[in-house]
Structures are given as C-alpha cells and as structure tokens.
Amino acid sequence: MFDGNGVTGAVLAVGYYALFLGSGMYIGRKLLCKERYSIVMQYLVGSVAGVLALQWFPLLFAFVFDFSMTAHVLALLLQVVLCVLVGWRCHCSESSLQQHPYRKVNEWKRLFRENPVWILMAVTFAFFCYCLYTHTIVGNADGSMHTGQSTYGDMNMHFSFITSIANQQTFPPEYSLLPGHKLSYPFLCDSVSSSLYLMGASLRLAYVLPMLGAILQVFMGFYCLIKYWLGRSATALIAWILFFWNGGLGFVYFDNAEKIHKIFAEFYMTPTNYLDKNLRWVQVMVDMLIPQRATLFGWAILFPLLAFLFRAIAERKKKLFVMAGVAAGALPMIHTHSFLALGMICAVWLLLDLTDNSLFVTGKAADGRKAASASRGSSRRNGKVTSSGRRNGIATASGRRNGKVTSSSRRSANVSASTGNRRGSSSADATVSDSWIRYALYIGLAFFSVMQMINRSNEFADKHGLAIMIIGVALFVLFLGYKLVRYLQNRSWKRLAFTWGIFLIVVLIFALPQLFMWTFSQASGDNFVRSHFNWSNNGDQYIVFYLKNLGLPFVLLLLSSFVVSARNLKIGAPYLLIWFVAELAAFQPNDYDNNKLLFVGAVFICGIAADALVQIYERYGAVYWCSAIGKAGVVLLGACLLFVSAISGFLTMGREWVSDYELYTASAVKACRYIEDETTPWDVILTSTAHNSPVPALTGRSIVCGSSSFLYYHGLNYQQNEQDVETMYTSPASAKELFRKYDVNYIYLSNQEYGTYNVDVNGLYEVADVVWQKDDVSVWKVKDEIFE
C-alpha cells in the first residue's frame, strides 16, 4: 500500500536502511583506518559502501528469488557476513587510530571551526528537506496529493518504478508504463526505495529517506574532492558555493516588480530556466538534485569516488584502486551519465599520472618538496641569481629595495609559504611543458565559436559533430597510448598494472554485465549517440551563451590561466574533454540531458574558478585593496560578489520553496486504494497516457502505455500502444481484440481520460462493468467473456 503499514512498516524500513548504512560505515572505517584518509572521509566512503550494498545485494538474490522479502533477508545476511569478515581481517591498532585528526572532542570542534562549509551544508540540507517534505505527494485536507514545480514531472515516473518493482517483484523488472519491455533505465536509484517500500514504509517515506543520505554524500564528496585537489578550506568553500548555489546572470532579465512576481507565479519562468531568454543552465539543487533521482544517486557515488580516487593515485596502493574499481563498476545502472563522465575523468587523470604522479601528491610535505625543487632549479642560471631572487646583483621589486625587505616581499613570502602548490610559489609552473594547459581553454572557445559560425550557414556541426568528436577522442586516445608506451619503456610495468590496471579490470568485471544486459540494448536506437552541436544554445553567440548562463564561474575561468597554477589547471583538465564530447554529440533522444555530463565538468570549473578568486585576492587584493578599504572590506566585497553570482539561484530556490500543484485528485487517490485492495499486482489497467496518471504511480500496476514524455526519451517504441489506447477508449466495442492483445483487466476512467479522448461510455458497457465510482473517477472490470 502506498499509505504504508503504519509505524511497524516505517520502523522496519528505517531500520533496514540504517543497518546497511551503519554497517557500511563500519566497513569503511575498518578498511581505511591505516590509510591517509581523515575520519570524515572514512565514514563518507563507508556510507557509500553501505548504500551500494543496499542497492545491489538484494538484486543479486533477486535473480533467483525475485524482488522478494527472501532476497532482502539474504542481502542483509550477506552484509552481516561481510562486516564480520572485514572486522576479522582488518585490525586497527590504537596507534593507527591516534594518527588521524579529529578523533577527540576538541579535535572535532576544530574540524567545524576550520571548515565553515558545514554551516552552508546545514542550511542547504534544510532547504532540500523542506522541498522534499512539501513536494512528495503531500496529502491535502480534501484527500488530494500535491507536489512542487520541479517534481511535477519526473516524480511520477520514479513512483511507477518504485511501486511496480516492489509490488510485481518480477526481476529483471519491466516497464509498468510499457509492459513487455525490459526496464533498462538506470533503476537502482529507485529500487533502493522499492526495498524500503517492500518493508512496509509508505511511498512517501520510501521515496524521501534514501535521498536524505544521498544529498549529504553529494555535499561531502564535492567538498572533499576540492579540498584534496586545491588544499584549502577557503577555496573549497567558495567552490561549494559556486556549484550548489549557482545562478548565472539571468537575474538581469527580471528588472522590475512585475517580472519578479512572475518568477514566483509562472511555471518555469525563473532566472535559471527561462527558454525565451535562452537561460538553460539550471539551478543544481532545484532542477538536478531534487527531481532527478538518478543524478542525485549517481553523484552520491561519483563525487566521493573522485575524492577517494584522487588520494589513491597519490598513495598508489592496490587496495585503494580495487575499492575504487568496485564503486565505479557499480555506477552504470545507478546513473549512466556519471559512469561516462567518470571514464573521461579517469582518462585525463591517467594521462597526467603517466606524465607526473607528483601532481596528485598533496600536503605540506609535498608542497615543501615542490618548492625546494623549484627553488633549486630557478635559483641560479649562469652563476647569477634569477628573477626569483636578484637580477645582476640588484634586488627585484619582490625582494629588496635599497637593501631593505619590503612589505610586499614579506606578504608574498607568506602567501607562497601557505600555498605551496600554487603558481606564485614555484617558477616550475612557467615551463614550456605547462603552456598547453594555459591556452587549452581559449583554443577550445575559439574552436567552438568558429564551429558555431560555420554551423549557422550549413549546419556542418549538427551533421558531423559525432564524427568530429570521434576523431578528437581518437587523437586523445592515441596520445594517451603514446604516453603509456613511453612510461612502460622507462618504468616498471608493475607500478601501473597494480594501480590503474587493476582498477580498469575491476571496473570492467562489474560494469560490462550491466552494460550488455541493460544499457546497450536500449541505447542502440537511432536517437542515441548522434551528432548534436552546442547543447541547448538557441541563438546566442557561443561565449555569450555560457557567460550569461554560468556567470561568475565562467568569468573566473577565463582569468584562471593567468593566476592559477599549472598543477591545479591540469588536475581540473577533465572538464575540457567532457565539454568537447558533450558539445558535439548527444547520448539520448533528449539533447538537453547532456547537462548531466556538463555539470560534472562544472565541478572542475567551479574548483578552478574558486582558486582563481583566491589567487586574485592574495596577489592583488592583499596588497592594494586591503590598504584602501581594509581586510574586512575586502572580505565583504568578496562575499557580495559571491552573493550577486547566486542571486539567480536564490530566486529559483525561492520559487521552488513556494510552489504547490495538485498532482492527484482526491477521488483518484481513493480509486488507487481500491485498485491496490481489489486487484492483483500483475493486472493490466487501461488509463490515459498522461504523465501524472495516478494508477501506475501509486499502485505499481502495469498500464497499456505511459506518457510519451517518459517513453520517447528512453528510446522505446510506444507509438502503436499509444494509438491502441485511444482506440480502446473511443471504440471499445470494436476493440475487443486489443483488450485481449494487451490482457487488459481493468479500465480507469476520469477527467484525464475524458479530456484526452472522445470516450464512448456506452461502448465501455459492452466490454466492462463498473466496480467502483466516486465523483469523476470510475474503475471498470473487463468482462471475462472478452477473453473467451
């Protein structure tokens, strides 16, 4: 029942979820207690492991026992056995535990004091919780169910997956929206809720609970990645704001009270999603993480995995690469776009690792080694002190003037000491080998701008974008292969085989069965993997489009080549490959869905932008601005800049906060309760193809055909079913063969059906009898004689 089994069902479901989550954190702590991961990262990795177990273990047994309670009990037993084995094999001595920070109470206080992002996470998490609470089939006083703006569409589809998997228990599952077709959509983001629904949780609780844990994993995974990469809490904080409170420059189109009022009154007329003004870069919280469960659960794995993999590359331990490979291999049926993005990120990072592994080494020791090496290499040339010290025996402006150390010198020295991996601390970043990363962005922007001009005249890029993308990727792979051969010629193959090699093998072992069983069969249609140029730009010049959509991060990205270290630019380089691929090809019928790739690239863009902002402040603000307006004034100015960059996002979040729409009428909800009580989970019910049809969403029953807004973008051939639905409503007496063809047991009739079809009610009486009726809604049972 979508109402749940009361307190008992809720407690059982919450307990089941908590057991997997808690045991996963225990496993993560045990496996990583001797590694150089903070306790926060250990628990984060453990929580991801627990959720992966909850998503995958029941499915392993479901192949034999279907998606039943038996499969879930066995899954829990498997998790318990795994905990026992890990606890038995992994012993953490007291000394190994003591080496980690943030172990005592006062150390935990320091954790919160040194990482103020916790405050922003708490506020944003509260917003997320409120939106889920007010948007997830909220019961109104009259018995109807309501939702919000962003969840008005996709939530119905996710409900149908959750309820049908749990109620029908068939595995592998089929589309309840198109019976007879294997469910190839990445359904693990929904099966995790199906497990809780099976335990007795209400549909609302089963839907919301896993999302609460997932959003925290997304928040923490992003922050840990940026901090590992850039090494500073302040930079990670700014990057976090730029990504999760993104807004762009769309607010400039809402320059009077009337237009601002429309933001909160119209359907999708916000500063981040306004088609008439070509505003397409949506607000992450509102339009990506709240309504799109696959994206949420995909990022909940991807972001912590990237942070974990970053440290694994630096540590070069086989165990860490095996763990990363297992998590990566589990991604395809959670979120295929995240898996594809991960592949591109790993390809770029592998290339960097083959060139210089020290790029991924973080910490003061590594910074000291780099600074010392740079100092030795640049201190003397031809017996003379270079520009980093003196020129021709005379102190430079950054060293001494008239034999005295200037305040600028001291300030620069302090900045360099505290930011050892930045450009200002080492002249090594200015070498010729680093120049490519400083020009890559501008070359890419020029390339796509020229492509856009050519495309406007003859649609060259729209026709041949896929071929251009394949050629570009092939050249990248060839260069990667060349670097790989050079690496193997100069170093031991074992060093690579037991890190990246074993990572690739583990990924393929876990991912290939998913790809062949589900993904490839559905992605083989003509509308998958095809040429498409410039994502969702509808008329703007290429650079202008991204300038107004991304706003401050794009401006800072343009400046980054002048202020950000080559090391940080290189590690953030995966966004270049992701952007190149996503701008030339589409990977499903909905072109817009390439933003699921672009937003992963934006993770690195926000990191680079945050680093650029910090560098600009430390190079120029600390010297010039502080003397004019004081340090507090500079900090306030920076805060105002970030606030302005987030105004569009705040307005969009405000719109989502107040949005309220009726999703299912009171009589429709009552009809669904009747259907759940009086029909079997495998009965097929004839309904309209409306996206918010309550029957598949609330009851999990199969219908003849669901909404084209779902089925078309999944690459399914639904058109004949859609035509037959109309025929069965408009000419039921002459459509008896269709009732037999689709094995229709019941007919659902409401204002949705009356408004969509010219319903022949008299004809319906010839094939079915009314068994339930309330207001405009009636349920009909097809006569047995139809099937004789």
Annotated model-derived regions:
Residues 69-141, 233, 477-492, 788:
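Start-transfer (signal-anchor) and selected internal transmembrane alpha helices
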Residues 128-132, 245, 249, 334, ...:
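Transmembrane alpha-helical segments
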